[in-house]
């Protein structure tokens, strides 16, 4: 892990809130240092500032020990196998290196023996990132790191909306995993690590689309109560959608280990005055009259450090009859 072990953040998640967080990994790869353009990977086209500089693993690298050449060659091969874009990998490792060793920010590492220890530390950071990205992002997600942007996020939002799921639910799922990995993360969206968050969003959208993290609640004929259950790994979550009517009374009861979950209830059409009925709450119960007709989203995410089992009871009643679903729910585009 690049950062301390997970402890549940006492904050509200959601992409809008992410933009307000403070800096996680300061610095950039703009200044760079000699190692990242010369002795790490053969793909970089920049001219080396030292005449002795050659590619890793080459017989013409007399200033690197055989062990160092082998280490760098292994990093290169592993990065390529994982499909992680070169420049993103450099930027990500650089940002972490500068964060850990800020005294190195204004100097250029050389290929000499005096910087052997610093090169070793950079390589160790790069290896940590390869481990983390392999374990927590899909191959498809990894291949796009460094290229995610606002246009992608807008497209993901539209795709989630087609499932009657809003961006808040999607980002809740991503935040749960991201903050498990980086509990101190702040103001990261424009930093290299922000690409990791967006990669997680991409994977969570796929999980919604394949149904592994999404379930539409259907009431059996003549009933108004639904018992749901499941197991969540650390950083996992699940979205439940239910097509309900304005004026109905919704009651939720979540049975899970203490302080191990966050619960949200999102509206069919969120507004600035009423964006949610419940958001990122450690509460395990909620009840109230529904203000709108359409698809409501109930999101359960795990903040635990080990797998948990949970049961969710969803009860809807009406003064005259059992729940009546609207014949024509709102268009998916009503979500945001």
Say what each PLM segment does.
Residues 8-47:
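Membrane-anchoring helices that localize proteins to membranes
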Residues 217-238, 243:
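N-terminal edge beta-strand
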Residues 1-8:
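Low-complexity, Pro/Ser/Thr/Gly/Ala-rich intrinsically disordered linkers and tails that serve as
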Residues 233-273, 277-294, 301-303:
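Acidic, Ser/Thr/Pro-rich low-complexity intrinsically disordered segments
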Residues 228, 240, 250, 310-314:
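Hydrophobic residues positioned within well-ordered beta-strands of beta-sheet architectures
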Residues 300, 304-328:
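Edge beta-strands of jelly-roll/beta-sandwich modules across compartments, strongly enriched
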């Amino acid at each position: 892990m690049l950062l301390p072990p997970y402890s549940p953040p006492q904050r509200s998640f959601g992409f809008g809130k992410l933009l307000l967080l403070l800096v996680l990994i300061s610095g950039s790869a703009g200044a760079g240092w000699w190692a990242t353009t010369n002795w790490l990977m053969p793909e970089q086209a920049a001219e080396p500032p030292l005449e002795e500089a050659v590619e890793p693993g080459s017989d013409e690298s007399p200033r690197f020990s055989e062990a160092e050449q082998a280490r760098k060659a292994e990093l290169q091969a592993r990065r390529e196998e994982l499909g992680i874009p070169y420049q993103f990998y450099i930027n990500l490792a650089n940002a972490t290196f500068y964060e850990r060793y800020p005294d190195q920010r204004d100097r250029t590492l050389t290929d000499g023996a005096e910087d052997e220890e610093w090169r070793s530390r950079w390589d160790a950071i790069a290896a940590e990132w390869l481990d983390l990205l392999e374990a927590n992002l899909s191959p498809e997600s990894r291949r796009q790191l460094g290229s995610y942007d606002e246009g992608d996020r807008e497209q993901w939002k539209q795709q989630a909306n087609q499932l009657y799921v809003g961006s808040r639910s999607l980002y809740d799922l991503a935040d749960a995993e991201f903050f498990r990995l980086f509990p101190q993360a702040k103001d990261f969206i424009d930093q290299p690590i922000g690409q990791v968050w967006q990669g997680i969003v991409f994977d969570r959208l796929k999980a919604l689309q394949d149904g592994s993290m999404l379930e539409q609640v259907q009431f059996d004929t003549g009933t108004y109560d639904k018992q749901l259950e499941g197991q969540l790994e650390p950083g996992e979550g699940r979205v439940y959608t239910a097509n309900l009517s304005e004026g109905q009374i919704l009651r939720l009861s979540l049975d899970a280990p203490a302080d191990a979950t966050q619960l949200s209830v999102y509206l069919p059409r969120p507004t600035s005055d009423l964006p949610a009925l419940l958001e990122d709450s450690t509460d395990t119960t909620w009840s109230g009259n529904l203000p709108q007709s359409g698809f409501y989203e109930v999101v359960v995410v795990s903040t635990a450090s080990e797998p948990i089992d949970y049961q969710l009871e969803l009860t809807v009643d009406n003064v005259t009859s059992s729940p009546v679903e609207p014949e024509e729910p709102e268009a998916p585009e009503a979500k945001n």
